[in-house]
Amino acid sequence: MLQIFKHKKLKVLKAIFISYDQAHHEAVVDILTRLSCRGFTSFGEVQGRGSKTGDPHYGSHAWPSIASATLTMVEDDRVDSVLARLRELDESKPLLGLRAFVWNIEASI
């Protein structure tokens, strides 16, 4: 069975976790679509607070902003392009907040 996979070129995948103000959602999906990152999972409403600056996103009376998050798996050679576009989006509206983190994918099915 190992011989079957010997000749297949395995793609190196990375996970990109993107946390952002809900106002960025359409733009985040558009970035992924334009860069041919077809598969992703969005978490519609999440709560959190940035580690450096920015207001908490708790969806409460005191902190009404709401955050969203998206997780996507992309080929290693697309990571830099995705991060560059996300950085541009974040810099265009810095008060909203957007963070992205990249992890190695060790295995998948």
What is each of the regions a protein language model found here?
Residues M1-I109:
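Positively charged, small/polar-rich N-terminal and surface patches that mediate targeting and assembly
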